[in-house]
């Protein structure tokens, strides 16, 4: 039986490593993507790979997904620091929105049958008046 594959986009932080550890215990094959392969993570396993990925490059995304047939994709990339997000609004918009959008477009256009989780804060939507429908 083939192992289920989880791709953790931007998974070198605390949350990504925690997800990877949990899923490795459940016998998943894990692919963590990062923009910087120099960043070291303290996790080694025969079912874990670290891949460099440009989240704005649809061909790289498509190749990764087609090659690995993910069961689930976690999108953890992007700016997570509120202080930094206000200092570099364009980069925050690019990484948090456009990067996620590119991933979703590839999933849709290539008909990748997977679960998708975007870990984000409701703060990204700003102040909402009334109920969300």
Where are these regions (language model features)?
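N-terminal Rossmann-fold cofactor-binding loop
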Residues: 33-38, 55
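Short beta-strand element of Class I
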Residues: 29-31
């Amino acid at each position: 039986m083939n192992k289920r594959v989880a791709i953790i986009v931007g998974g070198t932080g605390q949350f990504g490593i925690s997800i990877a550890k949990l899923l490795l215990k459940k016998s998943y094959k894990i692919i963590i993507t990062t923009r910087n392969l120099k960043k070291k993570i303290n996790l080694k396993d025969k079912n874990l790979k670290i891949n460099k990925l440009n989240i704005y490059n649809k061909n790289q995304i498509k190749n990764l997904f087609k090659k690995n047939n993910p069961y689930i994709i976690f999108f953890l990339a992007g700016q997570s620091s509120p202080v930094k997000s206000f200092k570099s609004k364009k980069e925050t918009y690019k990484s948090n929105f456009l990067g996620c959008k590119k991933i979703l477009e590839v999933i849709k256009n290539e008909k990748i049958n997977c679960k998708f989780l975007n870990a984000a804060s409701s703060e990204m939507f700003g102040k909402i008046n009334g109920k969300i429908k």
